């Protein structure tokens, strides 16, 4: 069974009962490079495997980028 959630402002259908960690794996996103906000609350990375996504939840991904060159 699928549920509807909002991911980065867009409606998506996902499998009912999955955790944040499972959702990230399904999207091929490495947990160590993203911060997840669930219903306007930042979720601690250690809780990704136990936090279940529910119908109507709002999920935001914030990715960390590296690289570049800074000169004075």
Q: Residue spans of the language-model regions?
A:
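Short structural boundary motif marking the start of a folded domain
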Residues: 1-5
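Loop/turn positions that initiate beta-strands
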Residues: 56-59
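Short, Lys/Arg- and Gly-enriched loop/turn segments at beta-strand edges
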Residues: 66-72
